[in-house]
Amino acid sequence: MSDAPRGEDAVLVAVQAALAGRPGVLTGARALSHFGEHSAGWVALAAAGALAQPAKRRSWLAVGAGAFLAHAAAVVIKRVVRRERPSHPDIAVNVGTPSRLSFPSAHATSTTAAAVLLAQTTGVPAPALLVPPMALSRLVLGVHYPTDVVTGVVVGALVGKAVGKAAGRISNSVGAEGDR
């Protein structure tokens, strides 16, 4: 008989018990996982935005760059911290992962950076719409502890803000042509 889950393991077991059995939850969480893998979905969305809205090309490219840089930052932090993914027997792992390292969640990091930059580009409150589902998906799938996800959101927000400021400075230095 296994030990009862405690701390963050208990939180994951509770989240999975409450949500994983609901229709569409695991399918949606897996879809988000595949979309966010290596920030590829955000980079593709940014490329499509740059093609569809040439007047906002630089802003859209900043979305892709920010998502990718946030992912890269998360990978570097993972390699330094080396925290293993959840492994308690009561936690169901519902998707494959590219590594055993969990801190921080690169999905939460790149999604938050992309959302911050999408909000600047589109005016839509993207962080409120995009970050919670991706963050929760990492718990439902059993591949991250809550602190992995929260830290990913914080790192992503910092990267998104920094890239947004840098992109603004670049656009301002280009002159009156704005985003072209």
UniProtKB/Swiss-Prot annotation:
One of its GO terms (biological process) is cell wall organization. Keywords: Cell membrane, Cell wall biogenesis/degradation, Hydrolase, Membrane, Transmembrane, Transmembrane helix. Disulfide bonds: none annotated. Pfam families: PAP2 (PF01569). One of its GO terms (molecular function) is hydrolase activity. It is a multi-pass membrane protein. Disruption phenotype: Non-essential, can be deleted, but cells laking this gene show a reduced growth rate. Deformation and bulge on the side of mutant cells are observed. The cytoplasm is detached from the cell wall and possesses a discrepancy density compared to wild-type cells. The content of D-arabinofuran residues (Araf) is reduced significantly. The keyword Iron does not apply. InterPro entries: P_Acid_Pase_2/haloperoxi_sf (IPR036938), P_Acid_Pase_2/haloperoxidase (IPR000326). SUPFAM superfamilies: Acid phosphatase/Vanadium-dependent haloperoxidase. It catalyses: trans,octa-cis-decaprenylphospho-beta-D-ribofuranose 5-phosphate + H2O = trans,octa-cis-decaprenylphospho-beta-D-ribofuranose + phosphate. It is found in: Cell membrane. It is an enzyme of class 3 (hydrolase). The keyword Cell wall biogenesis/degradation applies. Its EC number is 3.1.3.111. Belongs to the PA-phosphatase related phosphoesterase family. Phosphatase involved in the biosynthesis of decaprenylphosphoryl arabinose (DPA), which serves as the arabinose donor for the biosynthesis of arabinogalactan, the major mycobacterial cell wall polysaccharide. Catalyzes the dephosphorylation of decaprenylphosphoryl-5-phosphoribose (DPPR) to decaprenyl-phosphoribose (DPR). This is Decaprenylphosphoryl-5-phosphoribose phosphatase.
